[in-house]
Amino acid sequence: MNGTEGPFFYVPMVNTTGIVRSPYEYPQYYLVNPAAYAALGAYMFLLILVGFPINFLTLYVTIEHKKLRTPLNYILLNLAVADLFMVLGGFTTTMYTSMHGYFVLGRLGCNIEGFFATLGGEIALWSLVVLAIERWVVVCKPISNFRFGENHAIMGLAFTWTMAMACAAPPLVGWSRYIPEGMQCSCGIDYYTRAEGFNNESFVIYMFICHFTIPLTVVFFCYGRLLCAVKEAAAAQQESETTQRAEKEVTRMVIMMVIAFLVCWLPYASVAWYIFTHQGSEFGPVFMTIPAFFAKSSSIYNPMIYICLNKQFRHCMITTLCCGKNPFEEEEGASTASKTEASSVSSSSVSPA
């Protein structure tokens, strides 16, 4: 084995010289330069500085403006709530441990950080599944006269949290476990060991099949069918120009969220699977640290995509920030009016980008 395994940790360094210490008790500066830990702490501070205000603003603006409280936006708000959980429960913990160079908060802190990071990522993934299914049903119309309503949105929310908990909670109760990873200042699922009594192998396989491969397959199927339907509708001119534009722009926004999710999480998932299938092989602490911390940036991309691509939300946000007045009223107001008209015509009954 090209690492050192101990009680509830795995350090990617062979302890031939006796230098390796528990990441819960001692700084891990023998792994990388101390400056790297300072850089990680600064990075986490930046994510908190950006992630908390932008996600909180997304929630506040939607609550403040009644016209934004549409069923589809319930799912988008669900992403903001999940991101806030990651920021408050995970990022603050990781920033603090990075500043100390080891997981100074112990096993409890490791469980909290690992749980919130996993929960947030899974809520994002399953929310994208619900959005993809909604787009497919509304645009492709496999169910005639279907209208995505408030009850469907609430069921979608319950589904995303149930599935996310089914992935994030088991390591807390003994099916696998959360341990420090990479530079030992953030925690994740134990892909590294076959520790007796934790059944890591079965959990990792379960997680990759049920909580990564299957949801992504559903997403790709829905959007594959959706893109074909949009092209066919455009060619046949079956819908009004306003409705087609509305559906296309909502679809574009959700597809951008899927692409951003893959950019953030696919490197982490790929490295995790490689480590799991090559347990005992040699890899450095940075090998897992970079994709793990890159994945954490997912907390800011959803609201940014939403703000950039949804003119109605952007108009409401500017109005809120400017104390009820929009200095770009003429430009934004005209766009919002046209989008609101599109919303009333659209069979999805949403306020699209």
UniProtKB/Swiss-Prot annotation:
Disulfide bonds join 110-187. This is Rhodopsin. The gene is rho. A lipid is attached at residues 322-323 (S-palmitoyl cysteine). Phosphorylated on some or all of the serine and threonine residues present in the C-terminal region. It is found in: Membrane; Cell projection, Cilium, Photoreceptor outer segment. Keywords: Cell projection, Chromophore, Disulfide bond, G-protein coupled receptor, Glycoprotein, Lipoprotein, Membrane, Palmitate, Phosphoprotein, Photoreceptor protein, Receptor, Retinal protein, Sensory transduction, Transducer, Transmembrane, Transmembrane helix, Vision. The chain crosses the membrane at residues 37-61, 74-96, 111-133, 153-173, 203-224, 253-274, 287-308. Residues 62-73, 134-152, 225-252, 309-353 are cytoplasmic. CDD domains: 7tmA_MWS_opsin (cd15080). The record marks 113 as: Plays an important role in the conformation switch to the active conformation. It comes from Diplodus annularis. Its main location: membrane. Belongs to the G-protein coupled receptor 1 family. Opsin subfamily.
